[in-house]
């Protein structure tokens, strides 16, 4: 086993080189000259080995050092061992960097590594999507040149990273940005897309504002009549009018609460098993009678129903969807309108539609009709007691049945609401 180079080994090597000179000097004479020749030869041999080592280090691409003898053997072997250890460390470091990058790529956030001055030296794939960075083209670019937002520049300039920065991009995307210094003069920037969270927060605020607005009117009416009753005794027609109005407002609040509970129940419902057999034709007969009562013969109702077409699904949700579409057509069309309700089988599945020849809906209202509390004709909705929740209930109910609500309308010609249940949900007649 080789050992490290020592003074004893060097001295022994010098002594062995001088032995021939001592022997020759003892027999021939001129000992100093022989010793000088031996030392010179030893120096030449060391110089030759030094040149070989230099060639291997700077020119030769071989991983194995040149063979050595004498005192050069442990030195060259030690260099070889050191090189192998460095190679192993580089391999481990490369594997560690690869695992780090793989982990960073799987993060649900955009990650950017920069210098303290903002020069980018790495980013993950999500950063390229969210921040529109190009890697490796943007390597070395200052991030302030790529994200040109004054609030972002001020955030980096102030260097107070105790709180995240909420940044709104030009495409209306909301980002939450955090910056963490993690080594000397290097920063780790993490950007999270919180657009959906902001939308949900906005929807929550709008929801409570709309609920408060919807309840304020009937409560104000009730409070007014109660104060009137407290101050004076109402008799005859005035009393009947007050009671009728309070009853209407109470029913309006009750209807609103019921629809809110229905919508909440449908939204929170887990995935449906789709095993319940639903007799839609019988359901439509009940809806037709109720719609005729609601219409009071002001509109013409025409029902075209395939009496053999039954489906699988959730009966309560499907009833909510069908009844809301039919009642909306009655409530939101003027007298004399013809309303056609159809339940037919098609090659793609079971198609339900409600079509009228009423005034139609303006195009700008159609994408918003299924939003909670949205009402295209607010004046008419107030007259009919509409809450703006019916189509939201329909949308979620048909979505649970792997379908979607389609709305087609032309101003002055009429409107058509429909949804198509997939073929696999059609019940067999022998079931």
UniProtKB/Swiss-Prot annotation:
User: Which GO cellular component does the record give, naming just one?
Assistant: plasma membrane
Q: Give the superkingdom in one word.
A: Bacteria
Please give the residue ranges for the topological domain Cytoplasmic.
Answer: 1-13, 60-431
Pinpoint the PAS domain residues. 98-166
Q: What sort of enzyme, by top EC class, is this? A: transferase
Q: What is its EC number?
A: 2.7.13.3
Among the record's GO biological process terms, what is one?
A: phosphate ion transport
Q: Per UniProt, which keywords does this protein have? A: ATP-binding, Cell inner membrane, Cell membrane, Kinase, Membrane, Nucleotide-binding, Phosphate transport, Phosphoprotein, Transferase, Transmembrane, Transmembrane helix, Transport, Two-component regulatory system
Q: What is its main location?
A: membrane
According to its record, how does it sit in the membrane? Answer: Multi-pass membrane protein
Q: Quote the catalytic activity from the record.
A: ATP + protein L-histidine = ADP + protein N-phospho-L-histidine
Q: Which CDD domains match?
A: HisKA (cd00082), PAS (cd00130)
Query: Pfam families of this UniProt entry?
Result: HATPase_c, HisKA, PAS, PhoR
What residues bear Phosphohistidine in this entry? 213
Histidine kinase domain residues: 210-425
The residues that cross the membrane are 14-34, 39-59
Keyword set includes Transport: yes
Can you say where in the cell this protein is located? Cell inner membrane
Q: Topology check: give the Periplasmic ranges.
A: 35-38
GO MF entries: ATP binding; phosphoprotein phosphatase activity; phosphorelay sensor kinase activity
Gene3D superfamilies associated with the record:
1.10.287.130, Histidine kinase-like ATPase, C-terminal domain, PAS domain
Functionally, this protein is described as follows: Member of the two-component regulatory system PhoR/PhoB involved in the phosphate regulon genes expression. PhoR may function as a membrane-associated protein kinase that phosphorylates PhoB in response to environmental signals.
Q: What is this protein called in UniProt?
A: Phosphate regulon sensor protein PhoR
The taxonomy runs: Bacteria, Pseudomonadati, Pseudomonadota, Gammaproteobacteria, Enterobacterales
